[in-house]
Amino acid sequence: MEHSENVFFFDPLYIVVIVATLVISGGAQLYIRSTYARWNRVPNAAALNGAQVAEVLRERARFGNRPGQQAITVIKVVPGDLSDHFDPRDRSLSLSQGVASRPTVASMAVAAHEVGHAAQLAEGSAWMQIRSLLVPAAMVGPQIAYLFIIGGLILNATGLFTVGILLFGIAVLFSVATLPVEIQASQKALAMLQETGIITSKQEHDGARSMLTAAALTYVAAAVTAILTLLYYITLARRS
């Protein structure tokens, strides 16, 4: 791998990959935020804020054979902007302040999406189980991967570089496995909103679907950028 460290830092292809990932990720974030801002100005007909939507769904929606109070142990408010998430470890559902407090179409969709994750866990979703298995490795894999990749370049050690690529591949697998999890959660969210009568108009349905689609695109962007980066590392290894 002679002189490969110089190739890594000054290779035009590396700059192209970096710019592409920034554009893709930035574009996805811009789209989700603009979509959220649009539908966060539209009140939902049920006049329910995000926390109330989550509570209604917990009481009325289906979670396999598990009661809603077991599928979602607690609904809490957390700081941050669009920091909403469902934690499968303790089955807690966290909503950001804006989502929890506003009775809008956007808040309704975001809250329902997180409840959708609770339904996935209760029903034993295979994709969610696969993603959960990858979480520990995906949390530390990329950081360790960069150390091996940079070390392999500096030391001209093909073995180290290869290990780094394999470790980074775990993060790529996690990103790819996340896609069906998020898409399925969104599908469940729309179905639950309709089945429980929270959605009462085509406008609300279209708005919720727009929100959920925009959210899904952020995960598509993450997967695409991870794949592009992995392909660059593989290309670099082959020509070094």
Where are the model-predicted features located?
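Hydrophobic alpha-helical transmembrane segments of small proteolipidic membrane proteins, enriched
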Residues: 2-38, 152, 158-165, 171, ...
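Alpha-helical transmembrane segments of multipass membrane proteins
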Residues: 147-151, 230
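Conserved helix-loop functional segments at active or binding sites
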Residues: 150-153, 199
